């Protein structure tokens, strides 16, 4: 797997989502988090004779309701010129094989609301919208503020 391709696909996805200005990661961070001593995130790549055409970036989750580990697919991206060739399906198949091999129960992901072609692909493969649930995110200052409150309450980060 080419590290540079993984980073380039992350940047291409951000550009596609009209969010290039929000990418904070660097090639060095991709190397450390995906290929360092203790990776916690993985990338499955699909290539053809023209090179790497797509990527599914994922990490392990846990479902208390299922009592099982699972996969959260953080990013799925196929280069525009390679769409319609079944590459997204191949990436999903690879993740399904990993899940089946490990006995994991569930795969989850999010999709931007205006990306109807992706929504159509996900539904075609058996994905379901989770009615009544919203995704939330916390980045930066709110995290720091909560950590400071925790320190003031005598908490530590020890696991």
Predicted regions and their residues:
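Conserved acetyl-CoA-binding loop-helix of GNAT-fold acetyltransferases
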Residues: 78, 84-97, 120-124
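C-terminal "cap" of GNAT-fold acetyltransferases
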Residues: 105-159
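A short helix-loop-beta-strand connector motif used in the catalytic cores of GNAT acetyltransferases and
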Residues: 32-45, 72
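Short, small-residue-biased leader/transition segments that mark boundaries at the very start
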Residues: 1-3
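Conserved beta-strand in the GNAT
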Residues: 45, 51-60
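Conserved GNAT-fold acetyl-CoA-binding loop/helix
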Residues: 7-33
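A conserved beta-turn-beta hairpin within the catalytic core of GNAT-like acetyltransferases
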Residues: 51, 62-73, 83, 102-105, ...
């Amino acid at each position: 797997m080419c590290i540079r391709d993984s980073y380039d696909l992350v940047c291409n996805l951000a550009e596609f989502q009209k969010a290039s200005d929000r990418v904070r990661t660097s090639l060095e961070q991709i190397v450390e988090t995906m290929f360092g001593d203790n990776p916690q995130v993985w990338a499955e790549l699909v290539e053809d004779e023209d090179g790497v055409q797509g990527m599914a970036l994922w990490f392990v989750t846990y479902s208390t309701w299922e009592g099982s580990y699972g996969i959260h697919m953080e990013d799925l991206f196929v280069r525009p010129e390679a769409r319609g060739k079944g590459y997204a399906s191949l990436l999903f198949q690879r993740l399904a094989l990993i899940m089946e091999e490990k006995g994991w129960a569930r795969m989850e992901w999010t999709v931007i609301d205006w990306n109807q072609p992706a929504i159509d692909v996900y539904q075609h493969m058996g994905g379901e919208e989770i009615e009544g649930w919203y995704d939330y995110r916390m980045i930066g200052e709110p995290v720091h503020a909560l950590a400071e409150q925790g320190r003031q309450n005598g908490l530590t980060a020890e696991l």
